[in-house]
Amino acid sequence: MLKKIMVIIVIFAVVAVVYPYKKLAQTGFQFLSVSQVSRASGMGEAFITICDGADAVFYNPAGMVLMRSRLFEVSVNNLQWIADIKYSSIGMVFSPFERRYGVFGMSIMWVDYGVFYGTMVYPSLDGYVETGTFSPRATSIGVAYSKNLTDRFMVGGQIKYVALNIGRTVIPDAISETGLTAKDFVASVTAFDFGTVFRTGIKSLVFGMNIRNFSKEIKFYREGFQLPLTFTMGVSFDLLDLVDSEKRGNNSLLVAVDAVHPRAYPEYVNLGMELKLFGTFSIRAGYKSNQDEYGTAYGFGLEKFGLKFDYSYTPFKNFDGVQRLTLKFSI
């Protein structure tokens, strides 16, 4: 079993080494890079080693097997992104037969970009003519699986269908009688996520790795592009593990660090902290390095009787701050 674990770790290391470092800003479908879960965002997205259950389908599918409920868990997320772009997502996990056959999951995400007015170059006084309105839409639907290889090592993967419809436009066409033709710009592709979580056995020290949005090249019309492929390594630890168990009670102070290597941007680091009091109320703060528009984030959470509510706020420099809401239910 140790050999299998080492092979998986080596595969992740090789992927990180051969990753095309010089190709920055060569990706599309950037909606896949926007954080969905309030708890993750409130911790600066330093989340791949602490995500569990339904939240894990959006960050590290290996964490699904760490779900706290016995059978079923669902997470509903909503956020108003910049420029009035609306994100909604649902994560679900199901653990039949007391996890003897692993944990199964599903993720659904959809994005509403609002209504836009189309125009076309035209030899008129204004130099253009309106072509009507259009409403871009984006969708991601995935199925996932996670399993314990040992009591300390977990693996998981997700296959997802992602699509982006940016509407219909009129383009030049030499064959057409009018010299113009209408075209729907729609692109879709199958993408994959892979992840691991390793509990060291040294108190609560956890390591994790994951790859998100691995796919073939796609294109709308002529030029091809890649999805926002991202490789992440992370570590987390509960600082209250250093305190006597009688003094700490049902409290925790999680600290997490993720090193992120995206295809489209230079590398950066996510830092996050979560203080949980009495196993019910959580306060969070996070920081993302090497960002132009935003860096800090804050949040809180409440959980009781299988219900959980999370909220986070991310301030932006030149835009209104982004608020995220998450409702979680488990049985």
Residue ranges and their predicted role:
Residues 4-14:
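Sec-dependent N-terminal signal peptides
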